[in-house]
Amino acid sequence: MLKIVKKLEVLMKYFVPNEVFSIRKLKVGTCSVLLAISILGSQGILSDEVVTSSSPMATKESSNAITNDLDNSPTVNQNRSAEMIASNSTTNGLDNSLSVNSISSNGTIRSNSQLDNRTVESTVTSTNENKSYKEDVISDRIIKKEFEDTALSVKDYGAVGDGIHDDRQAIQDAIDAAAQGLGGGNVYFPEGTYLVKEIVFLKSHTHLELNEKATILNGINIKNHPSIVFMTGLFTDDGAQVEWGPTEDISYSGGTIDMNGALNEEGTKAKNLPLINSSGAFAIGNSNNVTIKNVTFKDSYQGHAIQIAGSKNVLVDNSRFLGQALPKTMKDGQIISKESIQIEPLTRKGFPYALNDDGKKSENVTIQNSYFGKSDKSGELVTAIGTHYQTLSTQNPSNIKILNNHFDNMMYAGVRFTGFTDVLIKGNRFDKKVKGESVHYRESGAALVNAYSYKNTKDLLDLNKQVVIAENIFNIADPKTKAIRVAKDSAEYLGKVSDITVTKNVINNNSKETEQPNIELLRVSDNLVVSENSIFGGKEGIVIEDSKGKITVLNNQFYNLSGKYISFIKSNANGKEPVIRDSDGNFNIVTENGLYKIVTNNLSDKNEKEKNKEEKQSNSNNVIDSNQKNGEFNSSKDNRQMNDKIDNKQDNKTEEVNYKIVGDGRETENHINKSKEIVDVKQKLPKTGSNKIMELFLTVTGIGLLLTLKGLKYYGKDK
């Protein structure tokens, strides 16, 4: 209040110069009037600032509209696809696609000045990140130097590291000493090539680190004996099996493990290890808290580079798996069981090196940030990660995470598994080349993600459940390759496949003569969700066959497919027949008997005119309530008319209807969001712009006139 009074005094001195004036001479009532005028004049400006900066409803609704439109735009999805391919981390690629379209955190479109500011902020952030990265590198080097200085060096225990002398015993002695607490439990391998001619046994509370130029060379060439460099349990020198006790807290970092499996000239055996049946790097059984990172694995012979059985809390991070030698004598049924990383329960059949047969599951296993491809000596890997065995006596491996890896031209699959529970396959990149560009090629085809079922006709078990396949990129050039396959492979098999989610994947199918669907879902028992996938090219988009229970197919987008976009198929005495047939243009899914969720998927026609029309409609998630059984929509014209009717009824509202069976009747629940109508922001906000200046001018003028009149009046009286 005092500040306002002083400002008014200054103003009066301007209008009545050369006189001593004090507003304190005015009556209280007059002062109140002046203050009221001033406050009223500024109220519009203040309220405008408040509403403009903090109108949560308007901002939220406009944000939802813009975000929905962009998320469903085919153009954005194409940009998203391109960005994800260019990025090593596909998850980051998806996130960055939004910033390309200039969307702020609250969903509003930024102005050019805001973009400039963002560029500056980005530069500052990038600088800070680079600084942080350098600091991390320096810190890592310091830690590494301290590790080297305090750890037990294998050369101090007699290792030579020339690739000729057998260094196995020296390495084992160093590990045994570290297990007793010497060197802080740390073992260091300086630069060199360390030949080992027998298995090295890892011990609890030990940490092995290799110089980046250090290599472990497998020289185990014993008939009927595992040729595996490191094991967490005991396996006697005479080949006798023992029951493994538990091990824990083991880490291995850096360097290269050469499994020495490159083939001889005839292509029938391992050139340097002719007596072995297979070669590998790690057998991890009955263990807890095991970490393997920054390791290069080269040239396994037939077998698994890493085998994980009955173990928990296992991490494989930032590693490379290069090359798998396959003899010409191998049959297809043998080949497809050769995963580079195998994850399985602890059984004698699955893990034959030990007598443990309790079926203990593997859990909390993460494979991330790694590359899988071919080497100079051997061809591509068969399957990067997975398993091929499961029985009733075992527990399902659970909480398996496969994140941000690159699977480069796998022969059979990037990920293939059976009997898994709680699986997340996210942010990976899968590339599949044509036969002419491949060393190893399977004529029967491939599925880059293959959740299949083990042949079980006696055991009732859950085959695969709670599986999420999300935000991956698939680049397919081979006509015999599917991107994603989730299946119970035979109706005669016991057990269920359920709770499957396939979402936000981008499939780029460039094969000119493709023979396979991009996504195949076979005999899923319940809770199947296929949503927000973008499929570019190929023959068929999504095929769902002989599946039941709750099925949701939502907001998928298709471009330049030569066949059907979405097919629901069931088998009967006459063979297979479609429950639903789609057609060119917009297609509305109507599931068998109207039991499942009914939504619209945005489809792209083969010409640009249709694509542009679909882009305009892409933010709709329309509902079709069909009482027909086995309804079929074969006319694209009818489909578009139905869409137009629904659009007119809904008036900027989005609704999804989920049908479910209750007894003999059908119950409807509106369980997904009803978006509010977007408010007209211009009508809701106060006047802005030039009106602000006018209000301010009138306010100042009014105050000036009143003060002048009152001041002159009292000036006369004082005289």
Swiss-Prot record:
Positions of the propeptide removed during maturation: 689-719
Summary of the knockout phenotype: Cells lacking this gene adhere to and invade human cell lines half as well as wild-type bacteria. They grow less well in human blood, perhaps because they are more resistant to phagocytosis.
Gene: pfbA
Compositionally biased tracts (Polar residues): 623-634
A family per Pfam: Pect-lyase_RHGA_epim
Segments forming a coiled coil: 601-658
Disulfides per UniProt: none
Chief subcellular location: secreted
Membrane topology value: Peptidoglycan-anchor
Chain residue ranges for the region called Disordered: 56-76, 109-128, 606-655
Biased composition (Basic and acidic residues): 606-617, 635-655
Alphabetic keyword roster: Cell wall, Coiled coil, Peptidoglycan-anchor, Repeat, Secreted, Signal, Virulence
Compartment(s): Secreted, Cell wall
Entry-linked NCBIfam families: YSIRK_signal
Use case: Has potential use as a vaccine component.
Protein name, UniProt field: Plasmin and fibronectin-binding protein A
Transmembrane portions of the chain: none
Annotated organism of origin: Streptococcus pneumoniae (strain ATCC BAA-255 / R6)
GO terms for cellular component: extracellular region
Modified residues (Pentaglycyl murein peptidoglycan amidated threonine): 688
Residues in the signal sequence: 1-45
Start-end of each PbH1 repeat: 287-310, 362-384, 397-419, 497-523, 525-546
Functional summary from the UniProt entry: Acts as a fibronectin-dependent adhesin and invasin. Binds host (in this case human) fibronectin, plasmin, plasminogen, and human serum albumin. Where the bacteria adhere to human cells there is major recruitment of microvilli which seem to fuse to cover the streptococcal chains. Antibodies to this protein reduce bacterial growth in human blood.
UniProt short sequence motif LPXTG sorting signal, positions renumbered to this chain: 685-689
UniProt-listed InterPro entries: Beta_helix, GH28_Enzymes, LPXTG_anchor, PbH1, Pectin_lyas_fold, Pectin_lyase_fold/virulence, RHGA/B-epi-like_pectate_lyase, YSIRK_signal_dom
